């Protein structure tokens, strides 16, 4: 199931001031995150440039998990960000993008949620994963790349993934124009990023984020290597940490860089 998908068509579908205004497209690359960082380092690529590939041979997710998709079925892209804020704030970019993807998917008519910190889900199955990486310049962020993989037109998944992953096609019963989906994500990301940099935290986006948080008020298991525990997800704080209430009423602030969170009874 293929659609027209190239630099020109993605550009035509992207109506923004800066996010994805410049599009780079390749049939194949190692990973769009690596490509974006190389382009910044070697070619002077700048803020908001978007790198899109039909296939990536070395795509990765959180905790270095491999990620790949059949050609002509997914969106694999990375946006380059050159921020002024401190490196400690960079992990929040994952949540900004997660909200943006969820809003785009909602706009095309699907009931969508965010599985904190970096997955977007439909029918409690993963439809999108996000990986943010940064390159330092002295003690500042030189650039950050936010990598996004969206399952768009896949008609099936391998048996071992079928209970955890889905696609826009499987959930809606019809294919989607991937360029239009990219354009919607960029529109929402530009709006959300501009709100984020005003405060350099998620205070302005928190109400919208929590409305879409699939884990909200759900039992979760925090997979901390030293001290795994169960509790109830109560939302996020302004720093993007998940607030988990233990059985005794104490509330933990869970940092996404250190642990995974799973639903007690399912992936979410």
Where do the model's predicted regions map?
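Long, positively charged amphipathic alpha-helical accessory segments at protein N-termini or as interdomain linkers
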Residues: 1-4, 18, 92-112, 122-268
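N-terminal lobe of the biotin/lipoate ligase/transferase fold
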Residues: 1-103, 128, 176, 251, ...
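Short loop/edge segments at beta-strand edges and connector loops
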Residues: 27, 114-116
């Amino acid at each position: 199931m293929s659609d027209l998908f190239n630099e020109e068509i993605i550009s035509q579908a992207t109506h923004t001031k800066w996010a994805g205004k410049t599009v780079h497209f390749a049939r194949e690359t190692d990973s769009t995150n690596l490509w974006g960082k190389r382009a910044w380092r070697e070619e002077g690529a700048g803020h908001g440039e978007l790198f899109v590939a039909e296939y990536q041979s070395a795509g990765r997710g959180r905790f270095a998990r491999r990620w790949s998709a059949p050609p002509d079925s997914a969106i694999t892209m990375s946006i380059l960000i050159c921020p002024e804020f401190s490196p400690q704030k960079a992990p929040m970019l994952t949540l900004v993008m997660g909200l943006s993807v969820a809003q785009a998917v909602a706009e095309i008519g699907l009931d969508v949620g965010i599985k904190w910190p970096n997955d977007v889900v439909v029918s409690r199955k993963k439809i999108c994963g996000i990986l943010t990486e940064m390159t330092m310049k002295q003690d500042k962020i030189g650039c950050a790349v936010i990598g996004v993989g969206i399952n768009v037109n896949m008609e099936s998944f391998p048996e071992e993934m079928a209970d955890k992953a889905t696609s826009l096609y499987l959930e809606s019963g019809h294919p989607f124009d991937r360029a239009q989906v990219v354009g919607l994500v960029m529109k929402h990301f530009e709006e959300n990023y501009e709100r984020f940099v005003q405060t350099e935290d998620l205070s302005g986006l928190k109400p919208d984020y929590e409305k879409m948080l699939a884990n909200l008020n759900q039992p979760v298991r925090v997979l901390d290597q030293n001290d795994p525990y169960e509790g109830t997800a109560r939302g996020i704080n302004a720093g993007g940490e998940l607030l988990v209430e233990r059985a005794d009423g104490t509330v933990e602030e869970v940092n996404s860089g250190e642990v995974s969170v799973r639903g007690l009874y399912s992936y979410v």
